[in-house]
């Protein structure tokens, strides 16, 4: 039975699309006020991707002007979500897991911790760990948590939606993974368990 859980935040505990207004409207307005050096069409595509991919990765992919990036990064470091967010309809499957639960999320610390606060779920988790993807990745943070809390990898299940991040890194460390893939974006990705929702999460955890 698994009784330690490393859980992603964005598009796992809650979905960004239904919360887009609260999460993104202010950021979109800010970016529209800048000369990003890309076409409107590319900006629309970038906005879509921002809902599921860390901002720095999106900016790199779509070629945002490098000279404006320090200003944008500074803005994002100081940004907080201040309106209530709604957890996913399946969140009760996560909440009812027995054991120690850690949120491991990529992004900007102030922004990510404010999301947890606005979701009203902070008390459901032992700790929240925000990964700065510009300097490290989730694999290094998983290793850090295992060492810090003296955890056995056989007891851990990693839950998330990113096949190229938490799922891939979990498997590389020999840890069981649950890939949440509602839109079947990763049909060929490796994962110990997978689902279009979280209804079989307890079975995967052996609970």
Question: What are the language-model segments listed below?
Answer:
Residues 78-103, 139:
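Short, acidic loop-to-helix structural element flanking the phosphoryl-transfer center
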Residues 1-3, 102, 111-207:
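Asp-based, Mg2+/Mn2+-dependent phosphohydrolase catalytic module
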Residues 30-34, 44-79:
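A metal-dependent, Asp-based hydrolase signature
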Residues 37-40, 68, 125, 179:
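Solvent-exposed loop/turn and edge beta-strand elements of beta-rich ligand-binding domains
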Residues 105-107:
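Conserved phosphate-coupling serine/threonine residues in phosphotransfer and NTP-handling enzymes
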Residues 43-47, 59-62, 89-99, 187-189, ...:
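Alpha-helix C-terminal capping segments
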């Amino acid at each position: 039975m698994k009784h330690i859980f490393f859980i992603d935040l964005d598009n796992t505990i809650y979905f960004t699309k239904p919360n887009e207004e609260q999460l993104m409207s202010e950021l979109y307005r800010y970016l529209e006020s800048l000369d990003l050096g890309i076409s409107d069409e590319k900006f629309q595509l970038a906005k879509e991707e921002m809902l599921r991919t860390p901002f720095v990765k999106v900016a790199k992919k779509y070629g945002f002007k490098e000279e404006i990036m320090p200003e944008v990064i500074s803005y994002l470091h100081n940004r907080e979500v201040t309106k209530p967010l709604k957890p996913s309809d399946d969140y009760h499957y996560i909440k009812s897991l027995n054991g120690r639960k850690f949120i491991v999320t990529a992004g900007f610390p102030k922004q990510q911790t404010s999301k947890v606060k606005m979701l009203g779920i902070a008390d459901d988790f032992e700790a929240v760990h925000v990964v700065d993807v510009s300097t490290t990745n989730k694999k290094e943070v998983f290793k850090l948590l295992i060492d810090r809390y003296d955890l056995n990898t056989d007891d851990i299940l990693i839950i998330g939606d990113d096949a190229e991040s938490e799922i891939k890194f979990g498997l590389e460390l020999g840890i069981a993974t649950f890939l949440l893939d509602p839109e079947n974006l990763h049909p060929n990705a490796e994962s110990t368990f997978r689902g279009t929702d979280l209804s079989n999460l307890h079975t995967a955890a052996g609970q």
